[in-house]
Amino acid sequence: MPNALTKTIPAVRQKNLFLLPIISKVYNVMSPELGHYFLVLSIFVALTNKLRPVVVSLYFFLFTMSFFGILFCYISSDFSNYNVFTNSNANAPLFYKISGTWSNHEGSLLLWCWILSFYGFLFCYLARPCNVSKQAKGAENKNISFLFSSKGLDQRERAVSLIDEQQIYKGIALFFSIFLLASSNPFVRISFVCTKSLAELNPVLQDPILAIHPPCIYAGYVASAIGFCLCLSKIINRQQKSLKNIYIFFFPFLVKPKKGRRPEMAGPHTRTSPYSRVPFGSLAHREQAKSVVRKTNTMYFHFGWTCSANTVVWKQIQIWILTCWCFLTVGILLGSWWAYHELGWGGWWFWDPVENASFMPWVLATACIHSVILPKLNDWTLFLNMVTFLCCILGTFFVRSGLLASVHSFATDSTRGIFLWCFFLLITSISFLFFFKMKQQSSTKLVGALSVPSSNQDPTVSNPVNQILWHSRNTLIAHSYQFNRLAKLMEGTEGHDKVIVYKASRKPK
C-alpha cells in the first residue's frame, strides 16, 4: 500500500507539471481578451446604485486583472497586441519591459485607472466608522423625522440629498472607465502574425528614474481626486445642514434631550416618534452619522492611519492632500533629475508644458497644505482642494490631446482631447455651481479673508493671504506657458505643432 501511494503521488505531480505549460499558453493567448472583458465589467460595476465595500473590491479586482493582463503581454513580448507591437522590444531587459507598460498613452491611462481603483478601495474600507457604540449604532441608517424625509422634497432636492463622496468617486471612476475602453483600449489585437516589434526601444527611455517618475505623478493626480470627492460632498451637505437647522428652529419639539448628553433628534424608530413605522429616507442622516459616538484610539486595521475611527472630514482631506503633494514632489524631482542627466538641457527645469502640467497642481497642493493644517475646514480650503483636481484634469488634457508640443507628450488624437475637455467643463461647472451657491447662503465671503484680523480675533485662525498669493502665482504660470500658446493657435499665427520625439544614440557627457 505505501508503495502504491509513492507511485501515484509523483504521477499526479507530473500530470500537474504537464498542465502548467498548457495553462500558461492559454492565458498568453487569452490575456488581451480577458483584460478587455474585465474593462467592460468594470463599467457595469461602476454603474451600480450603491458603492459598497464589496462593489469597490470587485472594481479594484477587475482593474488589477486588466493591468496584470497587459503587463503579462509586455513581459512575454506578445506582439499580437497592438500596444505591445508599437511600444516594446523583445531584446529589452525585463525591467524596461515592465516600465514600457506605462510609457504610452493607453498603458499609462490603465495605470491611472488602477491607482484610482486602489485609492477607492482604501477609501471605502478605511473611511468607514468602526467601533460604533450600541447607543448610536443605527444612527447612520435611521431617519430623523418625517419632516426631514427626502420623500417630502421635490425631485431636485431629493437627488441632491443622496449625493456623498462615494457617489462622486463613482462618477469619476465611471468616466475614466468609459474613456479607457472607448478611445484608449490597450487590448487591441492586430490581424496579422508578427514576430518582431514595429519600433525600436528609445535609448532615452531606458532609465530607471523614468520608470518610477510616471507612477508617482499619477498617484499624486489620483489622490487629489479623492480630496475633490470629499470637498464637493462637504459643500453639498452643508446646504442640507442649513436646511436642517431651519427645521430645528421652527420645530424645537422634535429635539429629544437626554440627561448628560447632547440633544438628539427624535428618530422615527424611537418611542417618542409618531412615525415609527414609516420607511422614509432621511435628509439629514449624514449629519447625524458624523456625530456617532465612537470609541477613541481605535483603528480599523494596519492601515488605520488613513482614517481612524474618530477622524473628521478635514483630517481625511488633510491626509489625501498630503499624499498628493508627496507623490507630486517625488515625481517632479525624479523628472528633473532625468531631464538633467539624460536630455542634456543644461538645467533642472525647462518650463516644458508637461512639466508645467505637474507643477501647477503641486503649487495648489502646497497652498492647500497651509490652509488645511489647522483643524478648521473653511471655504478657502474646499476651494483649493477642488481647483487642485481640476488643474490635474486640465494638465492631463494638455498632455494627451496633442494641442501643445512637448518632449514627452503622449498622444495627438483629438478624440481623446475632446473626451477630457468635456469632462473638465462638466466637473468645473458642477463644482463652481455648488461652491458659489454655498457662498451665497453663507454669511462669510472669500474677499473678507483679506481683511486685517482684529485684536479680538482668535490668533490661531490662519489668514489665507499666503494661499491667495500661491494661487495667483499658479494662475500666472498657467497663462504664460499654456494659454498663450492656445491664443496663438486660435489666431492662426502659429501652426499646429507636431510632437517632438527626442532620439539620442548616446548619453550626453
Swiss-Prot record:
Pfam annotation, one family: Cytochrom_C_asm
Residues annotated as signal peptide: none
Name recorded for this polypeptide: Probable cytochrome c biosynthesis protein
Keyword Transport attributed: no
Predominant location category: mitochondrion
GO biological process: cytochrome complex assembly
Organism in which the protein naturally occurs: Marchantia polymorpha (Common liverwort)
Keywords annotated in UniProt: Cytochrome c-type biogenesis, Mitochondrion
Superkingdom per UniProt: Eukaryota
Places the protein is found: Mitochondrion
